[in-house]
Structures are given as structure tokens and as C-alpha cells.
């Protein structure tokens, strides 16, 4: 009998994002095996039961179970959504330091299992924690990927699609940089069927104000959702499944994930959201979008902010 390799995913973190990802993964039939790890074992037990009951109506058969870090040893992909949430009065730096310590522990446990697959990081601040994951794991940069600006790009496409009355799948545009306040829209390359959208907006006096509004709506969407319902999880969960499919199915698609730069865009030693080819080997190639002078300045600023954060937590992962 011919041996057929199965696709095994281990999910670390069964909170709102993690459980949403698990559901979407099962619904779309992306993996053959899903193992869920979380400190709240009762929550995992309940979700495993619930997901197994949903699986018969999913995309394809999948084995779902609770597990420990030992399950990572033969996993193709380890997805990390675990981490501390920001508390009232807590600074962003406090949160970064707290999650860096958590990640150092998680990644060390995963590597101790003999894991040699690909890490996919979603916990915020995602760019910095992806950097932490690569530093602690010692894996090649191709094997450590962050969700980056994949959700921001989806939000940007949604806003543009609404503005121009077309399907979001017909919109070509990217948000790059930090997944956060310093991200930027690559307006100079955004288009529908080759028509430059920035020019269409700037040439229409009644729509010029929409350029800033579209970007602000994109950048600040998370704040609006959090204010309305407490957290964001469906969008990022679907984005993570999209990346998962690209990896497990060797799709060679280009997605705006958090990748490590080594000279691209004139930058190095930083994880940041940029268009990257994703396949079974991981993040194999960064694509350099032509940026205008303003976009180059904004991107350099975003890199500087991320490097400053990396430097502030470097002593925790030395």
C-alpha cells in the first residue's frame, strides 16, 4: 500500500482566535489531523468534542484531539495564538515583555519535542513575536511566519471594493509594514483591472477625501470591532486558514505575511508584513513592490518602530 503523508496541525492557544481558526480549518477540510493545546484543559476538551461533532459536515475527514507539546514532534505546522491580553493601565511595552516570556516558554517546549516543521504566529504584537519565535527556535527564517498584514490587506480590499462597487477578489492592493499603527497602504500599486485606484480617487474632487478615509477605516478597523464586541477573531482566523492552505497545499501564493527581511526593501534583521511567496517550505521569497518616495519613508519608519521593540525585548531572549 502506498503511504500518503497526512497534514498535521498543532494549535497552541484555544481562545477566541484559536477556536475560530480551528472551526474554520475543520469546516474547510484543510488538515488531516488537528491537535489543540491550551492551559485551560476543560475548554480544549469541550472544543474538541464540539469540533468532532461538526467534522462530518466539514470539507474532508479530520482527526481532532487535545494534546501536549509532545504532539508537535511530527507536526507539519504549529500555529500559535496563545498570549496575554493587554490589561487596563498596562503599557504596550509591558504586554510585549509579558508575551515574549510566554513565547520563549512555548517555543522552547515545542522545539524540545523534536519539531522541524513551520511556525505560524498570530499573537500580537505579531511582528515582534514572530521575531522572538525565530530567535528562540533557531529555525531558518523560511520556517517562521507571522500573520503580518494579511488581515489588514483584506480590510483594505473590502474598503476599496465597497468604494468602487466590485468584488473584493477583483481588487489588487496591499497593506504592508507593522501590523499596527505604523502600517501603510501601497496606493501607488493598488488597481482594479490595471486601473490605478489612487488616480481615480485623486482625479475626482468629490472622492479625494476618501483616500484618507479608506486607509483610516482599514487601519482602525480592529479598534472599532473591539469597541463593538470586545475582540476580533473571525477575520484573522480565516486569514490564518488561508496561510495554512498555502503551506500544506504547496500553493506558491503571494500573501502579505510577516517575513524576515535580509536586504529586501533595503532593510534587514526585522520581521515585518510584506508580500511573500508561501509554499510547503514556508516563506520562500519576499517580493519587493515598487514604492514611491512617500511609501518608502513610511515603510522605513515602520521598520524603525519594530526594531525599537525588538531591541527592548532582546535581553529576554538572549
Curated annotation (Swiss-Prot):
InterPro entries: L-lactate/malate_DH, L-lactate_DH, L-lactate_DH_AS, Lactate/malate_DH_C, Lactate/malate_DH_N, Lactate_DH/Glyco_Ohase_4_C, NAD(P)-bd_dom_sf
GO BP of this protein: glycolytic process; lactate metabolic process
PROSITE patterns: L_LDH (PS00064)
Keyword Secreted set for record: no
Assembly description: Homotetramer.
Protein role: Catalyzes the conversion of lactate to pyruvate.
Protein name: L-lactate dehydrogenase
Gene: ldh
Amino acid at each position: 500500500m502506498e503511504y500518503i503523508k497526512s497534514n498535521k496541525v498543532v494549535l497552541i492557544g484555544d481562545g477566541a482566535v484559536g477556536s475560530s481558526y480551528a472551526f474554520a480549518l475543520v469546516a474547510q477540510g484543510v488538515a488531516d489531523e488537528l491537535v489543540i493545546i491550551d492551559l485551560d484543559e476543560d475548554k480544549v476538551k469541550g472544543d474538541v468534542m464540539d469540533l468532532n461533532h461538526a467534522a462530518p459536515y466539514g470539507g474532508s475527514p479530520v482527526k481532532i484531539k487535545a494534546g501536549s507539546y509532545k504532539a508537535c514532534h511530527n507536526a507539519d505546522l504549529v500555529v500559535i495564538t496563545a498570549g496575554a491580553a493587554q490589561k487596563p493601565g498596562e503599557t504596550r511595552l509591558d504586554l510585549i515583555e509579558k508575551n515574549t516570556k510566554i513565547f520563549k516558554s512555548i517555543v522552547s517546549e515545542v522545539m524540545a519535542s523534536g519539531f522541524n516543521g513551520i511556525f505560524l504566529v498570530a499573537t500580537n504584537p505579531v511582528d515582534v513575536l514572530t521575531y522572538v519565535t525565530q530567535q528562540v527556535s533557531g529555525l531558518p527564517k523560511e520556517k517562521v511566519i507571522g500573520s503580518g498584514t494579511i488581515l489588514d490587506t483584506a480590510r483594505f480590499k473590502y474598503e476599496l471594493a465597497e468604494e468602487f462597487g466590485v468584488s473584493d477578489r477583483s481588487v489588487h492592493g496591499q497593506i504592508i509594514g507593522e501590523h499596527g499603527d505604523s502600517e501603510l497602504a501601497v496606493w501607488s500599486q493598488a488597481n482594479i483591472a490595471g486601473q490605478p485606484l489612487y488616480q481615480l480617487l485623486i482625479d475626482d474632487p468629490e472622492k479625494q477625501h476618501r483616500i484618507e478615509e479608506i486607509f483610516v477605516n482599514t487601519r482602525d478597523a480592529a479598534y472599532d470591532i473591539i469597541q463593538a464586541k470586545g475582540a476580533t477573531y473571525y477575520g484573522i482566523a480565516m486569514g490564518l486558514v488561508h496561510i495554512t492552505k498555502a503551506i500544506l497545499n504547496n500553493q506558491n501564493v503571494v500573501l502579505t505575511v510577516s517575513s524576515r527581511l535580509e536586504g529586501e526593501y533595503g532593510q534587514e534583521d526585522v520581521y515585518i508584513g510584506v508580500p511573500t511567496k508561501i509554499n510547503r517550505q514556508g516563506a520562500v521569497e519576499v517580493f519587493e513592490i515598487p514604492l514611491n518616495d512617500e511609501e518608502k519613508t513610511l515603510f522605513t519608519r515602520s521598520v524603525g518602530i519594530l526594531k525599537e521593540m525588538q531591541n527592548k525585548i532582546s535581553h529576554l531572549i538572549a
